Structures are given as C-alpha cells and as structure tokens.
Amino acid sequence: MDQYNLNTREGRWKHFGSVDPIKGTKPTEKEKMTDLQSSKKDFLFEIDHVGIKNLTYPVRLDGYQTAGTFSLSTHLAKDEKGINMSRILESVEAHYDNGLSLDFDTLKTVLITLQTVMHQKDATVDVDAKWFFDRFSPVTNLRAIGHADTRFSMTVEGDTTVNKSLTLTAMVTTLCPCSKEISEYSAHNQRGIVTVKADFAPEGELPANFKERILEAMEVNASSMLYPILKRTDEKSVTERAYENPRFVEDLLRLIAADLVELDFVTGFTIECRNEESIHQHDAFARLSYNK
C-alpha cells in the first residue's frame, strides 16, 4: 500500500482516494473543442422554449433586496441542435447593479440581450420574488413590513414586447356568511389565499403604483386584511370589521373581479381564492378568468 505524507493536503487527499489526472487526448483549448450545440442539420422540430429554471439571483424591488427565482428561455430553430446555456446567465449578469432591478423595463433589456446573443427570434422570462412593503395597523397606525408573492412574466420578439403580466399572491381573512347567519353568536373565519394574474398591454405604460392598486383590490374586498402588528385596539377593529364583512370565496372572487375591471391598465385577469377552512380538513376555492 502506498504511503503518503499526511502532513500535506495533497498527501491526505491521496490517502482518501484522490488520484493524479490522466494525460488526455482531447483538446483543452476552446477553439479546438467540438461545439455540439452549434451543429446544423434537420433536427425534426423547432422548440418553443429552451433554457434554465430555478435560477436564484438577487433582485431589487421597491427599495428592498430580495431573492428572485428565474426561468429564462428562448426559441430554438429546428436546424439547430441546442443553445449555449451559459449565455443565459451572462445576459443576466450584464445588467447586474447591486442586484437586478425587478421591473418590466429592466426585464425587457435582459431579454433583448439574451435574444441577441442566442441569435433567436424571441425570449421569455418569469421571475418569482417576495415583495416587501409598509403596512400600518388600522387604529394605532404602527408601521411594520408586510409582504406578498410576485411573479413578473414577459416575452419579447425583436424589440417588441408580445406579452407582459404580473401575478400577485396575498393572504387575507375571510369570515363565513353562513356561519354568521345560522349561529346565535360568532362565526368561523380563516386565512384566505388570493392569487391574481393580471395581464397588461404588451407595449403599454403602467402607473408607478400598479402593484399596490392590484393588491388593494385583493385585500379591501376581503373580510379583513392581515397585519404584521396589532395592538388591542387594532385587534378589536380587525375582528369587528371581519364580522361586518362576511365573504364566501365566491363573493371575494367577484368583488375583486369588479375592481380589476375598473383598472384601465389591466387588459385581462385570472383570480383564484382559496380558503384554508377552519372547520374542515379541506380547502374551499373559486376561480375565474376575464378578458376585457
């Protein structure tokens, strides 16, 4: 058995099974390596989307730095074998500035870069990120940080945006109208999870507060909003407001839809409301889609 100097890192590595590299026969210089992805012949089908998913990358959203989860893809013509996937992250890195600014203008710039370096006709991105914002308690007006989940989605062809949407997911309180109606006192209530996918005119301008206006439609139509901090006077207000505004999932869905119809920058939407029922082991849900 070979003896190694265990006082050195290399010796310890070999003691634990590491071996010296072999002398290979394949080229080590990039220019001499075979580029399989760039092979050209009939590969039978073009591909709508090919790229990477679950890329975690720092983003900046409304003054907060958070982690974004990216899916980035391009089209692939049928006479091309594959894409150079390293160029995807290079396209993101080219726009890094203490994180990537999470807004549609920046995402469009990233996609145009990606599309150009890939020599493809379109590019698509989806970014999931936590959105943090100030939330004030209803009576004492104490500030704390609230949050919602966002997904920014966009596709470009050339210099033109062909679709653009925002998905927001937020939690609310819902109090059961049936429980209130049939009970001598009290009513069961629970958290509701509301998800809105709002579509926008691809090349249209959005107001600076477009996220806030969509979130407001989701929250104010519930029995109550959720708050990070509640003192006793706040808790009394929240409890009584919920009792005064009972909502089935069907009610909440329709009320949110009515508000979204009135937002002129929203061209269509899909809403889902899901209640984590406090008196059942299952959830209740409702969903609708609408195009203006």
From Swiss-Prot:
UniProt keyword Cytoplasm present: no
A GO molecular-function descriptor: GTP cyclohydrolase I activity
Keyword Hydrolase: yes
Catalytic activity of the protein: GTP + H2O = 7,8-dihydroneopterin 3'-triphosphate + formate + H(+)
InterPro entries reported in the protein's UniProt record: GTP_cyclohydrolase_FolE2, GTP_cyclohydrolase_FolE2/MptA
Keywords: Hydrolase
E.C. number: 3.5.4.16
Superkingdom of the source species: Bacteria
Cited HAMAP family: GTP_cyclohydrol_B
NCBIfam families from the UniProt entry: PRK13674.1-1
Classification via PANTHER family: GTP CYCLOHYDROLASE MPTA
Function of the protein: Converts GTP to 7,8-dihydroneopterin triphosphate.
The name this protein goes by in its record: GTP cyclohydrolase FolE2
